[in-house]
Amino acid sequence: MIDTFVIFYKTSNYNTKDVLSLPGVIRELTRKDFDGNLRLCVKPSLFIKKYSSTESSNNKVLCNLKEALLVKDYFDKKIGEIGELRRVDFAYDTEIHFNENQKLNKFFISMLLASRNSSLNKIFFFFSNNTSLNMKIKNKTMEFSIYNCNDKDRLGNTRYEQRFTSLRGLDNFQNKILKSLNKYDKELCDLTSTIPVIETYFSELIYNEYQMSKNKYKNLHEFIAKMDASNFILTKNVFKQFFEKISDGNVDFYIKNFRRKRKDALKFITKLEMETLIKKIRIAIDKTK
């Protein structure tokens, strides 16, 4: 569903203070540039809350495309100009807390990087700080974030947010947004095909770390505990590929023994869990159209 959009107006006649008083406007992100052009950042759901008397909309924090475009029309008429839609933020919220789902989140955003032909070497930089409550990737046309939102007025505790930032032009806003949503949906549909790439990458990442730093650890058990706590052992296959490089032992026996000594350790993400997350986001995309 749609959370936020940014509209660009060339007018310099409208008072910025009047704009800031309009419902749904995000004050801290709305501004005029040196030429007097107005960059208006709006949460359409806040506008809908203001002007709708229905109980369902009083709890509304996201809206569909039709509702968002009606809100844009309101601002166009109020300002007296057809604004250029510069950015639209699509969001899916889940009740699961961010810290409880870090492996799945890391896996998901890694798959997006792979599908967008971005360097997976960015992953180690992004997630080396295990306390981070935000995972983000971006390029010239889009931004994607997974972040903690339990301190905000949201439908859940973790948000998966895709920002479409290449919507410039004064016409066919609906078609442009639909095209972007369909492209994102197609990407999600094909996303699980990147799983082997991600698993190989992380198994090699762990192996290289082991080769460089094994003298820092008392034993293999301690090293694996560190990698597991850092959320690098995403799936059983990641662990298996690494383990078979450094040991002739039985991988299933080792996992069972490791879990016996460390409660809640080596919890692997399954393909079904990933497919379930993807399905839920795709359903949200469909509801947005």
Functional labels for PLM-detected ranges:
Residues 1-246, 269-289:
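Structured, helix-rich domain cores that form ligand/interaction pockets
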Residues 241-263:
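Helix-turn-helix DNA-binding segment
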Residues 257-275:
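Short, solvent-exposed alpha-helical "recognition" segments
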